[in-house]
Amino acid sequence: MLTAENIQLNCYETVYILKSDLNEDKTLSIINDYKSMLTNGGAKNIVLQHRGRRHLSYTINDYHDGIYVQVNYEGNGQLVKSFEKSLRFDDNIIRYLTNKQKRNIKKDS
């Protein structure tokens, strides 16, 4: 039986790219909204890195530049599924990718 004491949390890394024509206030608002979404969903040890504007290797939706954001966190598969669904339907996100890291953390409390 699964209880809160023995739930396995997996480590994930999500990188998403925002449209380059967003102003700084809108960019920070989107980043903070997604961070709070992870926190409310039960993610632990959230590390957010705002990588800034970078040139894309190839054009995506007529954009040559994008604003990169990297988020590392611990959570379960359901959290990742809902997080990716939100990213998929956000018009300000032009691309995202989530990778599961090898290390597992056992939740103690």
Swiss-Prot record:
It is found in: Plastid, Chloroplast. GO terms for biological process: translation. The keyword rRNA-binding applies. Keywords: Chloroplast, Plastid, Ribonucleoprotein, Ribosomal protein, RNA-binding, rRNA-binding. It comes from the Eukaryota. Coiled coil: none annotated. The gene is rps6. Pfam families: Ribosomal_S6. GO terms for molecular function: small ribosomal subunit rRNA binding; structural constituent of ribosome. Belongs to the bacterial ribosomal protein bS6 family. This is Small ribosomal subunit protein bS6c.
